[in-house]
Amino acid sequence: MNERYAKCIPFDKNVKGRIGGNPPKCIEGQIPSDYKFYATLVHPEKENIMLSIIIHQDYDTLIDNNKYPSIAVKIVEHEFSEIGNCVEKRNANLRMCSISEYSEDKDSENILVKIGGAPSLIQDEESYYKELEEHGFSFFLSIDEDGYSEDVTIGSYPFGYGALYLYKRCTTNEI
């Protein structure tokens, strides 16, 4: 897969991908009680499919469970769905912003999403990816909090001004 990139842009109801706000209507009932909606992205490999990301609501739990196989992040694949009304599953630290369409153009410093290629690791420590690779996973995409626009966060950065790396199983394409 060619490397592609997306940026954090002001909210636009005509753009499918976004960070923050209420979860998509179709996944509201799938979010565990101790998780909050983070983002929904257009699946880079599947037409008309979205990837919604939900994260543990407790920062310490999220950070303490940040390596495979103990991860406090869940991915839900689904068809596009309108923004739901489930305010209690909204992450209060995030304002709603859109995620631009994917492009092969990397001329910006403010890259939010990177798809394919090699991950740009913040901490290049084998312990973060070695077990994933040993179990047949390869890098799929990353979301780097350095790519947030100025007005995305209200309080704390969900990943402590870090990044989220998603890997997929090579044999099944499970993320």
What are these regions (language model features)?
Residues 1-175:
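Preference for intrinsically disordered or flexible, low-complexity segments
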